[in-house]
Regions:
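Serine-dependent protease modules
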Residues: 1-171
Length: 171
């Protein structure tokens, strides 16, 4: 399952007249339920979705929203894992979600149809479709190079951390 993630933090902004002011800011992104243990639901997202957060809220497909805690981050790979306490979730929410099925990106081929699911523009879950345009695209950001999948499925602000699925529903 894909979830919406909201991040509330405080940003310090330089004033035009000198000095600084603090402003509360909110951003949104997406996450993918990748695991569950006895007490927590584990959600993978991008590090930049949760970086600098004072409060992280996860919203599920049934519109239930709960606070989440950061379990770990890897800024160089732009990855993060957040956790939601299972005791905060109703039986209805638990029955509406499931852990994502993981595929193997080495099995993808150019031209294969894919679906992108995320929290586009912070409006809640959206789905776009497209094709794998290229594999192993080398992209360098902040002196870190990654090998990525290129797709023509629309990816909008808020989709960060969301899922790119093959037609078998595998991540």
């Amino acid at each position: 399952s894909v979830v919406a993630i909201s991040n509330v933090g405080v940003q310090e902004i330089q004033s035009f007249f000198g000095g600084t002011r603090e402003y509360q800011s909110e951003s949104s992104g997406s996450g993918i339920i990748v695991g569950q243990n006895d007490s927590e639901l584990l959600i993978a997202t991008n590090n930049h979705v949760v970086s600098g957060a004072d409060t992280i809220t996860v919203s599920f497909i049934d519109e239930a929203s709960v606070e989440a805690q950061i379990k770990g981050t890897d800024a160089n790979n732009d990855l993060a894992v957040v956790a939601v306490d299972l005791s905060q979730l109703s039986e209805d929410t638990l029955s509406a979600i499931k852990v994502a099925s993981l595929g193997n990106s080495d099995d993808l081929v150019v031209g294969e149809q894919v679906v992108a699911i995320g929290n586009a523009l912070g409006y809640g879950q959206s789905v776009t479709s497209g094709y794998v345009s290229a594999l192993n695209r080398e992209v360098t950001v902040d002196n870190v190079t990654a090998s990525l999948i290129q797709t023509d499925a629309a990816i909008n602000p808020g989709n960060s951390g969301g899922a790119l699925l093959n037609m078998q529903g595998e991540l």
